[in-house]
């Protein structure tokens, strides 16, 4: 991985030329990276980037490095939103002709008459989840969605803007410095809001592994005394930002689902909200989705 990131040598090239000698400059750079890694600095900090959903995202000191388990947010959001895209952008069953299949596999263009999906990622950091979701939707149908990205950190917003431009998605994005919720001037109601909020209980931060404790921004980790402060704020106010049948999709800690369900009890009782839960690859509860609706959306069972 150090050779791949530090030297730009692809894995195939490393396997094809295992005895290749490194230039003095390259050797010096790799030794410096090794020294930093030996002091427990993570690769995402050393190289100021990380891979997520198959894309490389630029990071800085104000961004939490995206985790593999967070890809579940994107996967779940795609399941929820695909049913809302116009029919021509969805893959049909195997009964269609080869010509039809090839046509369906190409991204369609959204017509002016078709409403765009309005998406938001709050506490966005590098915006890896939100931009990955938007990129996938663009492959299904060009111009099908727009994305609001908000964060309290100016450095995080800078990284999000850089990443949106790198993926060619900047024209479909809006950015704002905000304390969790969009500013009042942002009047859009959203079809789906993604949030990976800080959820580590404050007292536990200093017991985390050095790669996280010493190099990740505590602003992106600290969820208050019990780790649930942001979920309480979301439960109190997020519904006002969502369309009818809109979804609030959140990542959470492995042992927090029951507490978050209790915090959101009013959504289920008074709003008739649908609730979806997803586990990560390790079998830990990881994602909760609540729908603002008088009737349940059957996009997922």
Task: Give, region by region, the residue ranges found by the protein language model.
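Conserved SAM/SAH cofactor-binding pocket of Class I
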Residues: 72-90, 112-207
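A general structural signal for well-ordered alpha-helical segments in protein cores
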Residues: 27-30, 40-43, 126, 130, ...
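Intrinsically disordered, low-complexity terminal tails and inter-domain linkers enriched
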Residues: 82-116, 136-143, 268-270, 294-301
């Amino acid at each position: 991985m150090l050779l791949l990131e530090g030297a730009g040598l692809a894995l195939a090239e490393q396997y094809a030329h295992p005895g290749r000698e490194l230039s003095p400059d390259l050797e010096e750079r790799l030794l410096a990276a090794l020294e930093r890694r030996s002091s427990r600095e993570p690769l995402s900090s050393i190289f100021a980037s990380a891979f997520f959903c198959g894309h490389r995202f630029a990071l800085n000191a104000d961004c939490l490095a995206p985790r593999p388990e967070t890809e579940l947010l994107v996967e779940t959001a795609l399941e929820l939103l695909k049913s809302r895209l116009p029919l021509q952008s969805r893959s049909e069953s195997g009964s269609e002709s080869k010509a039809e299949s090839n046509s369906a596999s190409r991204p369609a263009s959204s017509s002016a008459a078709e409403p765009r999906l309005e998406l938001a990622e709050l506490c966005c950091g590098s915006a890896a989840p939100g931009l990955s979701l938007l990129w996938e939707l663009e492959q299904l149908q060009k111009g099908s969605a727009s994305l609001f990205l908000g964060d309290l950190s100016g450095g995080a917003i800078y990284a999000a803007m850089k990443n949106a431009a790198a993926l060619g998605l900047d024209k479909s994005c809006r950015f704002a410095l905000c304390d969790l919720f969009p500013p009042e001037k942002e009047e859009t109601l959203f079809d789906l809001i993604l949030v990976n909020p800080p959820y580590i209980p404050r007292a536990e931060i200093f017991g985390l592994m050095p790669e996280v404790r010493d190099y990740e921004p505590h602003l992106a980790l600290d969820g208050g005394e019990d780790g649930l402060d942001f979920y309480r704020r979301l439960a109190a106010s997020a519904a006002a930002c969502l369309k009818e049948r809109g979804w609030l999709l959140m990542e959470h800690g492995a042992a927090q689902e029951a507490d978050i369900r209790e915090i959101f009890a009013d959504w289920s009782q008074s709003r008739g909200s649908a609730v979806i839960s997803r586990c990560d690859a390790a079998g830990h509860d990881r994602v909760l989705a609540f729908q603002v609706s008088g009737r349940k959306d059957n996009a997922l069972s």
